[in-house]
Amino acid sequence: MEVCYQLPVLPLDRPVPQHVLSRRGAISFSSSSALFGCPNPRQLSQRRGAISYDSSDQTALYIRMLGDVRVRSRAGFESERRGSHPYIDFRIFHSQSEIEVSVSARNIRRLLSFQRYLRSSRFFRGTAVSNSLNILDDDYNGQAKCMLEKVGNWNFDIFLFDRLTNGNSLVSLTFHLFSLHGLIEYFHLDMMKLRRFLVMIQEDYHSQNPYHNAVHAADVTQAMHCYLKEPKLANSVTPWDILLSLIAAATHDLDHPGVNQPFLIKTNHYLATLYKNTSVLENHHWRSAVGLLRESGLFSHLPLESRQQMETQIGALILATDISRQNEYLSLFRSHLDRGDLCLEDTRHRHLVLQMALKCADICNPCRTWELSKQWSEKVTEEFFHQGDIEKKYHLGVSPLCDRHTESIANIQIGFMTYLVEPLFTEWARFSNTRLSQTMLGHVGLNKASWKGLQREQSSSEDTDAAFELNSQLLPQENRLS
């Protein structure tokens, strides 16, 4: 197959503002057909740092146009990559002359999804694929394949798997689950498009985020798979349910900026304005997922009504992960359990259970073994503290749990388990009283006890240091000098 690497010069088929034209890596407006499916391979064009939509897709075009809102108000600021890295117009707080714009010493250049796919995919090298699993052969070794045989094990080590796959855990694991659940055959999916879709998802996670990155997405997807295997769900879910659940799990934190919703609101971030300060991040994750679904053309062979239904239901799943709405979903779930009227043959009830399953998967870190849970705790705390450092630097007021000088990992985790994790997983165990549910609750108890032990040690150490300092101050000057 011959590929033209030169960008075609096409006339603009709509008025485009000058600030968009001047933006490097902005939207590619094209009159040609979709990227895949062009009758002439020379019509393929490289993505220029953003999503390239067909000119007729007004909704998708609008979604990506939103990314240019920042350009109008931040002249002179150079973005490191596209996406939702939070931008604050600090001229509100300081004059332009007082701002010091620091440039990262590490120049991170995002390899565009099609570009990376073009270089690495076996399909573009003309290699025939006779089995759906053969697509995995070039990407990870026998150890990773061996791990995938135990992908339904709750002790699955996603950190080890990510190392074995050279940082491609989300692509490798999700593709395997699509094959394992028979989704490729059932929905007649083009493996090339599926592969490209998963690569784009993985790339749109920010690897520099300590916690909200592609590894977290892979971990949540693996947990979701475990829940789908539970008897009550396994006997009732349809292939459609499984498809939506896996896509929602893989994309539930897509393009996460590494800061929380209150940060975006108090800095007047354009996403907060767009979504009216309501489930800001979750709405953005959902809309980003919709953009990639449309760009990849993975389900272009399905009827329009089915595609629209898919987008809506994926949105409902992702929006359920908004931690600020935990009590709302938990109360509804608990009331159904109290009445005993959950009927999994009812699509609405089944969808509620899938929402609760994704919520559990999203915050299941304390339910893992101590070795895994501790790593996740350290990573999420690092991300919290990084946000707190930014807030201190620009005098924004440090958000709760984000001050590294007053908070500790132990305190944060104990509170998280007590007020969020235990109530959620207790109700999940009422719904699905299985060995896995009891194992998860058991891990929560053990991990909480471990953090309390570390908390006591830290408190004892601080008391000892304080006493030593006090004694040193009380000693006569000559004794201290001697």
UniProtKB/Swiss-Prot annotation:
Which cofactor is essential here? a divalent metal cation
Q: Which residues cross the membrane?
A: none
The active site consists of 212
What biological-process GO terms show up in the record? Answer: cAMP catabolic process; cAMP-mediated signaling
GO MF annotation: an example: 3',5'-cyclic-GMP phosphodiesterase activity
Activity regulation, free text: Insensitive to all selective PDE inhibitors.
SUPFAM superfamilies listed in its UniProt record: HD-domain/PDEase-like
Give the CC-aspect GO terms. cytosol
Q: For the PDEase domain, which residue ranges apply?
A: 136-458
Q: Which reaction does it catalyse?
A: 3',5'-cyclic AMP + H2O = AMP + H(+)
Which positions does UniProt annotate for a divalent metal cation 1 binding? 216, 252-253, 362
Keyword Cytoplasm, does the record have it?
A: yes
Which pathway, metabolic or otherwise, does it act in? Answer: Purine metabolism; 3',5'-cyclic AMP degradation; AMP from 3',5'-cyclic AMP: step 1/1
For this chain's record, the cofactor binding note is:
Binds 2 divalent metal cations per subunit. Site 1 may preferentially bind zinc ions, while site 2 has a preference for magnesium and/or manganese ions.
Q: Which UniProt keywords apply?
A: cAMP, Cytoplasm, Hydrolase, Metal-binding, Phosphoprotein
Write out the residues that bind a divalent metal cation 2: 253
EC number of this enzyme: 3.1.4.53
PROSITE patterns annotated for this entry? Answer: PDEASE_I_1, PDEASE_I_2
Q: What is known of its domains?
A: Composed of a C-terminal catalytic domain containing two putative divalent metal sites and an N-terminal regulatory domain.
The family classification in the record reads: Belongs to the cyclic nucleotide phosphodiesterase family. PDE7 subfamily.
Q: How does it assemble?
A: Interacts with CBFA2T3.
Described by its record, this protein's role is as follows:
Hydrolyzes the second messenger cAMP, which is a key regulator of many important physiological processes. May have a role in muscle signal transduction.
User: Which protein are we looking at?
Assistant: High affinity 3',5'-cyclic-AMP phosphodiesterase 7A
Gene this protein is translated from: PDE7A
